[in-house]
Amino acid sequence: DSSLLHIIQTQVVPVFKEQHPDIQLNVNTNSREQIQESLLNASADYGVYFSCEEEHPILDSRILDEDELVYCSKHDLLSDPLEHTKIMTVPKGNPLYAEQKRLFQQLYLTFPATSCEAAPSILFFLEKNGIGNTILPSKTMANNPDDRHFLTPAPGYFLIMAHHPIRTMPPVTRDLETLLYDTFETYFEHFAELFS
């Protein structure tokens, strides 16, 4: 996700390099599945990713921040006929996509045609400007409370930090863990500020 990459490159990497100038910190951007695979085969030390699942069955997972998903629309929930509803989703590889698809099917009894696929930050901007409807984390819509329509039961959405549970990590990684946690513990609350 571009928002995660931006925060890691501008906030996490400089602070970590200042604390540990002799340690090389490499940042790769991959899908959630690729990150998990890299952690499982020990080609990466830590992963930060979004998930609709609170934990991974093998990886040691820690929730950095959490939110619930809401239907985002300028109109009353389901007031527009399905054929006039512009549905926007994240791309199919994004972990949020499967949950968006499931929830749209639950709301409309079918998966409506998608008018746009984009990163959450772009969907946020488009919905804010009345371009279409989407499903996003609730706190991202804090500045647009009338656009939030809560779903029951409220589906969770999590920002996860994970690593392999039996891999021996050098002591310096505790500093990285703390830095990641401190940086991302209020990610969803500040999402709107980042992309306004």
For each feature predicted by the language model, list its residue ranges.
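Secondary-structure junction motif
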Residues: 85-108, 170-173, 177, 187-194
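Generic non-transmembrane alpha-helical segments
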Residues: 7-19, 103, 175-190
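N-terminal winged-helix
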Residues: 1-19, 24-26, 33, 99
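Beta-alpha-beta core module
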Residues: 56-62, 66-67, 125-176
